[in-house]
């Protein structure tokens, strides 16, 4: 019998804002957000819990945030500091395991299956890690502990902020059976509405459904939906895997048929893509991101992708890609549009310089 895995998902609490409050204690207890200025048509990168009481959230336009919360204290992004603190957190992780998969600066998966510290208890290990982060860095973290990767991520939100939640092998089956499908990664508003129309609300409902029907109705995602609902998640924690690209996509409430409609969606996706890039690559120019791609998924669930190396990241370049890939629709409706960009590397930069 295979060894039951022990997975921890660590998620820092309002990370950037928490660092700013640590650096300037006068901010504690006040609504604080990290983000761009109104003049620069900026958006919030994150905000603390005091600000969230006013309905503020990440990616909200700064101008809108200030209308909701006139006393909001806006702090500019300090990416070098956030990256330095993130590395300090990862040094704490590595005291317990080398199998660490970062998802962003403020969250990561840890595989502690073979860790012998804390008598091998993943629960105690997570608590020790969170204690160390607080004692050494004066920041709080939340954690989810489970035998499966997707479950660990889901339950890390369960006792936020500054808490943790455990799914043991013994209670995993019952927990998954009652788990709302909207909690599963990848189930957005549109997919959740479609599931609800079919009378599917929990993983238990999927368990009682026909496998072929789920696969046919939801395409490739149907396989993940079926497996997660049956407590199957064999994805490994990929240690030291550098992320090579970033993607954003939108499953549409209703299929579209016209290029003009698609261009409006690309506009919104481009803003979201730039926001996420600036969150993790704030010190890099958008012109350094040269390899772009666009994806269309059609009403029949087939999909196509077009990738190009360009002179840099811009809305105009994505619109050009959209106009080219739209020729492949062949009178089919479009149900999803996605944009992606490859991260620049030193090797790629040197190669490109030869042609500048």
From Swiss-Prot:
Primary location: cytoplasm
Site residues, Substrate discrimination: 16
Cofactor dependency: Mg(2+)
Designated gene of the protein: dinB
Species assigned in the record: Actinobacillus pleuropneumoniae serotype 3 (strain JL03)
Family matches, as Pfam families: IMS (PF00817), IMS_C (PF11799), IMS_HHH_1 (PF21999)
InterPro entries registered for this protein in UniProt: DNA/RNA_pol_sf, DNA_pol_Y-fam_lit_finger_sf, DNA_pol_Y-fam_little_finger, DNA_polymerase-Y, DNApol_IV, IMS_HHH_1, Rev_trsase/Diguanyl_cyclase, UmuC
GO annotation (BP), single: SOS response
Protein name: DNA polymerase IV
UniProt cross-references to PROSITE patterns, sorted A to Z: UMUC (PS50173)
Subunit comment: Monomer.
GO cellular component, one term: cytosol
Subcellular location: Cytoplasm
Gene3D superfamilies recorded: 3.30.70.270, 3.40.1170.60, 5' to 3' exonuclease, C-terminal subdomain, DNA polymerase, Y-family, little finger domain
Cofactor binding remark: Binds 2 magnesium ions per subunit.
Alphabetized UniProt keyword annotations: Cytoplasm, DNA damage, DNA repair, DNA replication, DNA-binding, DNA-directed DNA polymerase, Magnesium, Metal-binding, Mutator protein, Nucleotidyltransferase, Transferase
